[in-house]
Amino acid sequence: MRGRAVCSGVIDAVTVLPAAAAPHYAVVMTDRETHRIANDGLNHRLRLVWIGRRRIPGIMAGTRLRVEGMVSLRDGLPTMYNPRYEIIGIQEI
């Protein structure tokens, strides 16, 4: 499985690496709206990895993102490396 995709969702998990590890920032994003209504057996999770970065300002658990990039399957989870991203703010009522 490999292809270009545009996805949006909320960051559910952030991987913190030891200082001695090769720098990369990895998070898991879940499409919460789809997850709530879907009954298709899929988990609607996407791993995002930025190579060479220890953190990305503004991207943390709870942040809503729209991402674009190539998706491949790694360790059973769809993964996007160095995606383009847009932080989506919470709409005020």
Where are these regions (language model features)?
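OB-fold (S1/OB) nucleic-acid-binding surfaces
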Residues: 14-48
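Well-ordered beta-strand positions in beta-sheet-rich domains
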Residues: 8, 43-47, 77-79
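Hydrophobic core residues within well-ordered beta-strands of beta-rich domains
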Residues: 5-7, 25, 65
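OB-fold/S1-family single-stranded nucleic acid-binding modules
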Residues: 68-93
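Short, glycine/small-residue-enriched coil/turn segments at secondary-structure junctions
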Residues: 1-8, 14, 18
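A short beta-strand motif that forms part of the nucleic acid-binding face
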Residues: 31, 52, 63, 71, ...
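Short nucleic-acid-contacting surface segments enriched for D/E, G, S/T with interspersed K/R
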Residues: 2, 51-68
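Intrinsically disordered, low-complexity acidic/polar segments
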Residues: 18, 36-38, 57, 76-78, ...
